[in-house]
């Protein structure tokens, strides 16, 4: 537990960068150490230690999101091999609840960031578009493991949803016009006016008397 | 050279005398009472003294903290996330409803938004996971002079450090060798005793001898750990032909229960020293030792009573018992065991410590204090199946011990989550979507 002077400075720096409070950072740091086995970095394998995560059908996409360079703001594509605590917090910060004290511009920015995180989850080849293949891939993963749904049904569901998205984004299409994929602007358009902020955040408990030993 | 000689013999003499004294003390105060099942009350006195010392130590720390105007670090064990108990269906319906700017009759079968739910759930489990939390040791509020449980190092004054140093000295140099000697005596007596009894012809005498050999050795082991046990409701003690079921925090549970009653045990085969002990015990009494994965042995025995084991879990929750123990139609005597972590943490995190390290930790703590509650017997009713009965027993035990009831099976720690659970989630989700799909095609 950091009682040294430099540690609290680090915490303050992280507070500024990621927007978490110092209590939350301390809690997340303990969690980070638990996941990494007291190492300074986490690799993909460390997420196998979270048994509850196994239940999640899109587990691999979530884990991948942690190492995605676009989410880590380290590059336009590719995956990192391991992440440190600051990277961990950066990813977690996408799920911070909307602060009531934020002004409209900040709310808009936060919302865009959250949607971008989601977009990256769909767009696995980092080409900036969600193609039909990528969409199908997500639907199949969500529906995988159920023996009653054949691949065909999963596909048709994906195709149907993709057509919906196309109609929203491009309006009426010519018969030979090909819809290449959903770009981020289209993605934003789909979500215009719909309140996603309340669904894309983790609710932290109010922690009392959690003073650190400074 | 010559000058050294008298000193030499003096030292040797002193050593000899102190060893003899030690052994006599050992014999008189510990082993003899163990054989006859009486107690001098030394351990209770010891416990009271320790409590007074701990209270003083915590007071000093709080005073130190107040001087510096800070608060002591009180670890928050209840998790950091407010998890909403809504189900998968409700949440997804809500998400879709909030997106109802689309045409009302044109409910899409699958929306990009569905991924929100799983995304958030995934993040929440990464941040704070119910099952993993259960597996780390409980954290204390007052300090018990063991450095392993202290998070407030900077508030220790000089006096406290001296006290702590003294504590270390006592624990490692006096208590530890004493306990090891006792344990050694106890175990070797057990092995030798049961082997000898095994050679006797089957009959009442053999049973009588076996019972007493077992009891005696367990009592010695109990003293080897300085386990201070309080038994409640002894009138409900398991009787012949019943099955004793208890919550399992550590291998010490077996010793604690077995020192108060004669049980035939059902348990997992271990290697090494435990294996030797197990094999010896089998000679005198019909215990059943099985491989964890094989469960067919369970209906073997003419059980006298058997202890049921599960995975070691932290003291605060009771995991689902292995279903197998409840399928034989006998009377079940539930027993709740609760450890007081103030004197020594009995929790064994098997992935972190091996057996020997664990035992050493136990033997260098102050004492193991626990309470054992014998609950009234239960039988399976006609309309319950094994699982429901198991849950009923489990909640009775949890209620008594003040432990938190948790539906998870402790086996999670070792194996990966069974695929059936994962499929359940996905089935539920896909049912929702395919349901919609079918409705549309019908209309």
UniProtKB/Swiss-Prot annotation, chain A:
Keywords: Calcium, Cell membrane, Cell projection, Cytoplasm, Differentiation, Disulfide bond, Lipoprotein, Membrane, Metal-binding, Myristate, Nucleus, Protein kinase inhibitor, Protein transport, Transport
Record keyword Nuclease present: no
Domain EF-hand: start-end pairs: 110-145
Location in or out of the cell: Nucleus; Cytoplasm; Membrane; Cell membrane
Disordered: region residues: 1-20
Residues at which Ca(2+) binds: 123, 125, 127, 129, 134
Coiled-coil segments on the chain, per record: none
Gene Ontology biological-process annotations: cellular response to retinoic acid; male gonad development; megakaryocyte differentiation; negative regulation of cell population proliferation; positive regulation of DNA-templated transcription; positive regulation of gene expression; positive regulation of granulocyte differentiation; positive regulation of megakaryocyte differentiation
Membrane topology category: Lipid-anchor
Induction profile: Up-regulated during granulocytic differentiation in a ERK-dependent manner (is mediated by activation of ERK) (at protein level). Up-regulated during the differentiation and maturation of primary megakaryocytes. Down-regulated during monocytic-macrophage differentiation in a ERK-dependent manner.
Residue ranges, compositional bias (Basic and acidic residues): 7-16
GO cellular component terms, A-Z: cytoplasm; cytosol; lamellipodium; nucleoplasm; nucleus; plasma membrane; ruffle; ruffle membrane
One protein family per Pfam: EF-hand_6
InterPro entries found in the cross-reference section: CHP3 (IPR052490), EF-hand-dom_pair (IPR011992), EF_Hand_1_Ca_BS (IPR018247), EF_hand_dom (IPR002048)
Molecular function per GO: calcium ion binding; magnesium ion binding; phosphatase inhibitor activity; protein homodimerization activity; protein kinase inhibitor activity
PROSITE patterns: EF_HAND_1, EF_HAND_2
Lipid-linked residues (N-myristoyl glycine): 2
Distribution of this protein across tissues and organs: Expressed in mature megakaryocytes and polymorphonuclear granulocytes (at protein level). Abundantly expressed in heart. Also expressed at a lower level in adult testis and salivary gland, and in the placenta.
Keyword Nucleotide-binding on entry: no
Role: Functions as an integral cofactor in cell pH regulation by controlling plasma membrane-type Na(+)/H(+) exchange activity. Promotes the maturation, transport, cell surface stability and exchange activity of SLC9A1/NHE1 at the plasma membrane. Promotes the induction of hematopoietic stem cell differentiation toward megakaryocytic lineage. Essential for the coupling of ERK cascade activation with the expression of ETS family genes in megakaryocytic differentiation. Also involved in granulocytic differentiation in a ERK-dependent manner. Inhibits the phosphatase activity of calcineurin.
Binding partners and assembly: Monomer. Homodimer; disulfide-linked. Interacts with SLC9A1/NHE1; the interaction enables an optimal Na(+)/H(+) exchange activity.
Similarity section: Belongs to the calcineurin regulatory subunit family. CHP subfamily.
Swiss-Prot/TrEMBL domain comment: Binds calcium via its EF-hands. Calcium-binding mediates a conformational change. Can also bind magnesium.
Name of protein: Calcineurin B homologous protein 3
Organism: Homo sapiens (Human)
Taxonomic lineage of the native organism: Eukaryota, Metazoa, Chordata, Craniata, Vertebrata
Primary gene name: TESC
């Amino acid at each position: 537990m950091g009682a040294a002077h430099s540690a609290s400075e680090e915490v303050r720096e992280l507070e500024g960068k990621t927007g978490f409070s110092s209590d939350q950072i301390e809690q997340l740091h303990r969690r980070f150490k638990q996941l990494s086995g007291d190492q300074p970095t986490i690799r993909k394998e460390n997420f196998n230690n979270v048994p509850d995560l196994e239940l999640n059908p899109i587990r691999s996409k979530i884990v991948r999101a942690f190492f995605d360079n676009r989410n880590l703001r380290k590059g336009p594509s590719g995956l990192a091999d391991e992440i440190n605590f600051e990277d961990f917090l950066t990813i977690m910060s996408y799920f911070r609840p909307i602060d009531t004290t934020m002004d409209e511009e900040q709310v808009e920015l936060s919302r865009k960031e959250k949607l971008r995180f989601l977009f990256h989850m769909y767009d696995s080849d980092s080409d900036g578009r969600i193609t039909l293949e990528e969409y199908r891939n997500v639907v199949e993963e969500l529906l995988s493991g159920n023996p009653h749904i054949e691949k065909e049904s999963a596909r048709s569901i994906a195709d149907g949803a993709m057509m919906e998205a196309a109609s929203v984004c491009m309006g009426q299409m010519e018969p030979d016009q090909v819809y290449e994929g959903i770009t981020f602007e289209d993605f934003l358009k789909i979500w215009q006016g719909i309140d996603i902020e309340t669904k894309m955040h983790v609710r932290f408990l109010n922690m009392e008397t959690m003073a650190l030993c400074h | 050279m010559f000058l050294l000689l008298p000193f030499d013999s003096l030292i040797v003499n002193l050593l000899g005398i102190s060893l003899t004294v030690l052994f006599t003390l050992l014999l008189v105060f510990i082993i003899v009472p163990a054989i006859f099942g009486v107690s001098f009350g030394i351990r209770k006195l010891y416990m009271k003294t320790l409590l007074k010392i701990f209270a003083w130590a915590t007071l000093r720390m709080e005073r130190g903290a107040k001087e510096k105007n800070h608060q002591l670090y009180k670890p928050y064990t209840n998790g950091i996330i407010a998890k909403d108990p809504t189900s998968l269906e409700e949440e997804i319906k809500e998400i879709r409803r909030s997106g109802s700017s689309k045409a009302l009759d044109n409910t899409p079968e699958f929306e990009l938004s569905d991924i929100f739910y799983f995304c958030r759930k995934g993040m929440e489990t990464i941040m704070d996971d119910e099952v993993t939390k259960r597996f780390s040791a409980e954290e204390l509020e007052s300090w018990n002079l063991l450095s392993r449980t202290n998070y407030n190092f900077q508030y220790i004054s000089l006096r406290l450090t001296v006290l702590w140093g003294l504590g270390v000295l006592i624990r490692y140099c006096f208590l530890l060798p004493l306990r090891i000697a006792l344990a050694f005596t106890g175990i070797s007596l057990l092995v030798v005793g049961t082997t000898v009894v095994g050679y006797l012809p089957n009959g009442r005498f053999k049973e009588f001898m076996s019972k007493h050999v077992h009891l005696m050795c367990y009592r010695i082991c109990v003293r080897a750990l300085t386990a201070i046990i309080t038994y409640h409701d002894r009138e409900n003690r398991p009787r012949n032909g019943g099955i004793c079921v208890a919550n399992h925090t550590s291998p010490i549970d077996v010793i604690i229960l077995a020192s108060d009653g004669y049980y035939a045990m059902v348990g997992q085969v271990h290697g090494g020293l435990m294996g030797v002990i197990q094999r010896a015990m089998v000679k005198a009494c019909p215990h059943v030792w099985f491989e964890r994965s094989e469960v067919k042995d369970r209906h073997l025995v003419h059980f006298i009573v058997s202890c049921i084991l599960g995975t070691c879990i932290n003291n605060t929750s009771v995991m689902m018992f292995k279903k197998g123990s409840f399928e034989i139609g006998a009377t079940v005597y539930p027993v709740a065991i609760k450890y007081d972590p103030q004197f020594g943490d009995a929790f064994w995190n098997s992935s972190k410590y091996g057996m020997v390290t664990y035992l050493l930790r136990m033997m260098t703590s102050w004492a193991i204090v626990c309470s054992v509650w014998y609950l009234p017997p239960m039988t399976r009713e006609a309309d319950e199946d094994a699982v429901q009965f198991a849950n009923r027993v489990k909640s009775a035990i949890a209620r008594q011990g003040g432990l938190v009831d948790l539906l998870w099976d402790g086996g999670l720690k070792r194996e990966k989550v069974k695929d059936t659970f994962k499929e359940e989630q996905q089935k539920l989700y896909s049912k929702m979507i395919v349901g919609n799909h079918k409705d549309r095609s019908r209309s």
